Design a protein with these regions (language model features):
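Short, Lys/Arg-enriched N-terminal segments with co-localized hydrophobic residues
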Residues: 1-7
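Cell-envelope/extracellular polymer assembly enzymes that use nucleotide-activated donors
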Residues: 10-12, 43
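Short, well-formed alpha-helical segments that are part of the catalytic scaffolds
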Residues: 20-35, 54
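Short beta-strand/loop segment that forms part of the nucleotide-sugar
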Residues: 40-51, 71-72
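A conserved acidic beta->alpha catalytic loop
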Residues: 48-57, 106-107
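Acceptor/aglycone-binding surface of glycosyltransferases and processive sugar-polymer synthases
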Residues: 73-75, 79-89, 98-101, 107-184, ...
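Catalytic donor/gating beta->alpha subdomain of glycosyltransferases that bind UDP-sugars
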Residues: 174-236
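Membrane-embedded multi-pass helical conduit in multi-pass membrane proteins
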Residues: 237-261
Length: 261
């Protein structure tokens, strides 16, 4: 008997969450609505980062999504490590063609999934990133975020415009899963390991959380910056040394005799 699913591409959407079950269930329902016309088999894997809130008993009436599974972390490890665990698990255990990573709070808008899907069909061997062209936070946080991007660019030489919202072909998902730096920063590892020629992008608008205010604080943003920089630690050391040498040369070359006295 002919099985059309056998010919379809297999997409797995990887979502990491912590104490945000209400949001992730709403996200799954919205994903199901957005992908209804996809010519693909779609399933979801949730990595639960040792949530302390009980998972509600929710009946999901899904028309397109084939399955929803959950991996439970024994200890809270943070978003980056949950993504790393999910990538490693899927690369070693599952049959798929693409993995799409998403945040579980609604800030990665499911309305943009079809943009990623269509772009991956046009470029089947390339990683597709959702590059932010607009953010939803207030002006102060936007200023801090732009400062973070500039700092990361100065120290790493990489202008990273994307976060976790990325579509990975299987070959690159498996490659990333083997990198030690994936445990520090997903976006930093993508920028380091996957060359510009192997990446393409779609324009993305950061959405608003489904429930409650944004959980990213100034401290979280600092950790995020340092995590990306840590991925490029050798480059950072070299660039920092060169900047220091240039600065000292500039300072000493402009010292006057009066200053020396």
């Amino acid at each position: 008997m002919y099985d059309r699913e056998e010919e379809m591409k297999k997409f797995i959407i990887l979502i990491s969450i912590y104490n945000d079950w209400k949001s992730v269930f709403k996200l799954i329902e919205n994903i199901d609505l957005q992908i209804i016309d996809w010519d693909a088999v779609v399933s979801i894997l949730i990595v639960n980062d040792a949530s302390t809130e009980d998972r509600p008993k929710t009946e999901l009436n899904l028309k397109k999504i084939k399955s929803v599974r959950i991996i439970n972390m024994k200890k809270n490890r943070g978003h980056a490590r949950c993504n790393a665990v999910g990538l490693k698990f899927l690369s070693e255990k599952e049959d798929f063609d693409y993995i799409i990573l998403m945040d579980g709070d609604g800030e990665d808008r499911p309305e943009e999934l079809t943009l990623l899907f269509n772009k991956s069909k046009e470029n089947p061997l390339k990683t597709v990133t959702a590059n932010r062209k607009k953010r939803s936070e207030g002006p102060f946080f936007k200023f801090l975020y732009q400062s973070h991007k500039v700092l990361a660019y100065i120290l790493t030489g990489k202008l990273i415009k994307f976060g976790n919202y990325v579509c990975l072909p299987k070959i690159f998902a498996a490659k990333l899963a083997k990198q030690a730096c994936i445990w520090s920063s997903f976006s930093g590892t993508v920028a380091k390991i996957i060359s510009d020629s192997d990446r393409t992008s779609v324009a993305s608008i950061k959405g608003k959380r489904y429930f409650g205010p944004s959980k990213m604080s100034f401290f979280d943003l600092l950790i995020h910056s340092f995590s990306i920089i840590a991925v490029f630690r050798r480059t950072t050391i070299v660039r920092s040394t060169l900047f220091l040498i240039f600065y000292l040369f500039f300072v000493f070359s402009n010292l006057s005799i009066i200053t020396l006295l």
